[in-house]
Amino acid sequence: MDGDTVDVDIDLGFGMWMKKQRIRFYGIDTPESRTRDLEEKKYGLAAKAFVEASLPVGSTRTLTTVKDKTGKYGRILGKFKAFDSYTDAWVNLNQWMIIKHLGVEYHGQSKELIAEQHIINRGLVDLDAL
């Protein structure tokens, strides 16, 4: 798991489950948490920690998948809803992470095209406030 990919068990209803499914957050890219670039790693680990706090192990969340689409590595693409205690409302976690500068919008374009936005985000995200 990292800031834009999680492993989940999906309840399909009627006692049917899809276990240990890897879900790629749709429409977002976060900095890598497994990299030799220590600056990028710091922000990647912050995004990962934010996701772990928003989707704790054993919790139940709403996942909306993107119909008939998978990511580059065959992962299911999805959007999560998580509860934001500050606004006392359920929010689209994917968009919330972009708003908090933990990730950038991503729809399959090359990583080079979004690298600059990741660097800009480093100056905008408040790691202490997470």
Regions found by a protein language model. Give the residues of each.
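Small beta-barrel nucleic-acid-binding modules, primarily SNase/OB-fold domains
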Residues: 1-130
